[in-house]
Every structure is written in C-alpha cells, then in structure tokens.
C-alpha cells in the first residue's frame, strides 16, 4: 500500500474519472483496482441550489471519512477504504456505485415528517427505519421501494440487484448505523439519522463505499436538536453569513475530533480463561485467541477447585474487585467442579467450556446438572464460548459490540455468497 500511496500522490499519475458536488474521483495510472478520492471545499444544500466555498472543509471532511472508515474496518466490516494519503485524499478500492442512497433513521425528523404526515417529530424507531432513494438529481432523488428497485433490474458490474442484494445491504446499513451510534454515544451525542451508499467491485463484492462525513448524518449532542453539529445548521440558515459559515466550520471540526475517538477503547473488558489442569492449555488458548478477535483482553490461569479451592477463589476475588467487566470461562473435564465453585462464590458470569475427551458423554453432566443457586452456563465449542463472553461484555465496550455485530453479518454474507455460487 505504501508504493500505491506514493504513486497516487503524484499528480501525473491521476486522471479525473468523476466529479460531484463535494468530491473528485481519480483513476490511478497502473492501478486498475484502486481510485483516489479527493474532498473539495464546497458546502452545498438543497441539491446544490445553495452552495458556498468553505476553506478547510475538504481537510475536515476527508479526515472525518477516514476516521469513520478506519473505525468500521477495525470492527471487521468490508469497505472500499484503503488508506488516507493526504489531508484531503484517500485511496479506495474501485467500485461501480449502486445508484441507491440508503437512509437509516433512529428518530423521526426532517423530510420524513413531510412524507409521513401525522408522525410527531422525535418519534423513536427502536427497530431502525430504513428508506431508499434513487440517485437522480434531475428528479430530486425520488424514494424507491424494494419492489421498485427489483423491478428496475439494476445491473451493476454483472451483479443484478435483486431481493437478496437488497436484504444484504439492509443488514449492512443497520450495522453501520448501530456501530456509529455507539461511537457517538461516547460523547453523549445521539445519531439521529444517516445516509450511506454501496458499490460493487470487479469481483462482484458489495462494499460500503463513497464517503461518510458530517454531510452524511444528523447528530444531536445530549439528544438536543438545538445543539446539532451537522449540515442541518447550514440548511436552516435563512441567509448565509460569514458568522454562520464560521459556526459550520467550528461544528465540522468538532465532529472530526469526536470521530477520531471512535477507534479507541473506552472501557477495558476481560476474559479470564481458568483451567483445572495445565494439560488443557491448548484448548484454553483457542478460547483466548478467539476472545482477542473481539477486542477482549484475556488471562490464562491454572487452578483446581478440588485441590486448591482457596487459591481459586483468591484469583476470582482479584478480578471481581478490579472494576473491569470480566467473564470467567472455566475449562475443566471429568468432574467439573471449577465452573460451579466459581459461579457459586462470585457475581462474575461463568461459562463452562469442558475440553473434549473420550468420556465427554459422561463428564458433560458435571457441567450441566447444577444445584440451585449456581447460575453458570455451558458451551462446548471454544469459539462459541468466546463469542458468548463477547456478547455478555458488548454492553460495556462499543468496539466489542461492533465486532459482535460484524461477526453476525459475516455469517449472513457467507450464506449469501454460498447461494450465489449455486446460480
């Protein structure tokens, strides 16, 4: 990527491919799979009926987009973003854009109220409200239903956009919104709605594409519309003034700074993998490795509830009093006293994950049949135990939350791809 960045940074290697209201897209000489996207200082509203040049916006918009895509890629979401190479430019995988704008709404406001009279502003969609709009400037981007998208038979780089593709993009749209919503919540700000777009690679892969910057959403600090930070401030101006543009630039800068925090862990989360014998180390490390994929810190310990009961409970006490959200995964076969003893003497969640053996069908009952008041669970597969721990801890850490959502999406993408191979 470093050589690609060097090539893309030279003007003689760039050829203008397309230009929109707020960005330019360039082909990169010798790099058929990549493009360079350059932000402009243009600020527009009402389909460019209102337009101003705002010095510094290009830098802020490009950095905000980079912040957002780097965060989403940290979560494991496939996107077209590759690398930021200057203050106003980034390199992306080349895609043919699907001419549909996907809008996700958590709160009813703006144009939604005009299209749906009777709905009060502030109505909350617990299940995100999704809308789609066909990108057609001449007709003010008309709203399309799923049926209209299917009926129009959109063919994007040999990929026909049908019900399965629409369903997949809906899932991706919801994931993007929910992940960014968690990021914004770190600064006590509410993500109200947002718009995104998708593209198709030459391999036929659907990717989150285009840009996601402060023109892409509504954000209300403290859930108060009067404090809004997004482009709506510009739209709401009866008359554009220098003071008004200065406020817009200030808000955009604040958004850039806040989105830079999205990729940072705000709350540590821990998984203690405790095994009854050192011979279970390989199995326990599988759990640890899987847990780390979700952004969880892990510790491996050997301790026997039968032979070193007090030592086991001392280890648990250390984690219980640390203040760090922790899940215990107990790895013990034969007569599993480890998980039940910990669960019966601690408030920490405990998951039994007994290693397989020839006598598993008999030994498993020591992990399943519990006296009253224990409250531990049992999972047989190490990767599933790690996933269960991640789900328990997801409410404490936005990155763990996002990685869990992305893992679920990848399962859905795998099923989608398997069906495509059958066609």
UniProtKB/Swiss-Prot annotation:
Q: Name one GO biological process term.
A: 'de novo' IMP biosynthetic process
Region: AIR carboxylase; residue ranges are 264-423
Ranges where the record places region SAICAR synthetase: 1-263
Q: Which SMART domains match?
A: AIRC
Q: Which InterPro entries match?
A: PurE_classII (IPR033626), PurE_dom (IPR000031), SAICAR_synt/ADE2_N (IPR028923), SAICAR_synthetase (IPR050089), SAICAR_synthetase_CS (IPR018236)
Q: Does the keyword ATP-binding apply?
A: yes
GO molecular function terms attached to this record? ATP binding; identical protein binding; phosphoribosylaminoimidazole carboxylase activity; phosphoribosylaminoimidazolesuccinocarboxamide synthase activity
Reactions listed under catalytic activity: 5-amino-1-(5-phospho-D-ribosyl)imidazole-4-carboxylate + L-aspartate + ATP = (2S)-2-[5-amino-1-(5-phospho-beta-D-ribosyl)imidazole-4-carboxamido]succinate + ADP + phosphate + 2 H(+); 5-amino-1-(5-phospho-D-ribosyl)imidazole-4-carboxylate + H(+) = 5-amino-1-(5-phospho-beta-D-ribosyl)imidazole + CO2
Q: In which pathway does it act?
A: Purine metabolism; IMP biosynthesis via de novo pathway; 5-amino-1-(5-phospho-D-ribosyl)imidazole-4-carboxamide from 5-amino-1-(5-phospho-D-ribosyl)imidazole-4-carboxylate: step 1/2; Purine metabolism; IMP biosynthesis via de novo pathway; 5-amino-1-(5-phospho-D-ribosyl)imidazole-4-carboxylate from 5-amino-1-(5-phospho-D-ribosyl)imidazole (carboxylase route): step 1/1
Q: Does the keyword Iron apply?
A: no
What keywords sit in the KW lines?
ATP-binding, Decarboxylase, Ligase, Lyase, Multifunctional enzyme, Nucleotide-binding, Purine biosynthesis
Its recorded name reads Probable multifunctional protein ADE2
Species annotation: Caenorhabditis elegans
Q: What is the lineage of its organism?
A: Eukaryota, Metazoa, Ecdysozoa, Nematoda, Chromadorea
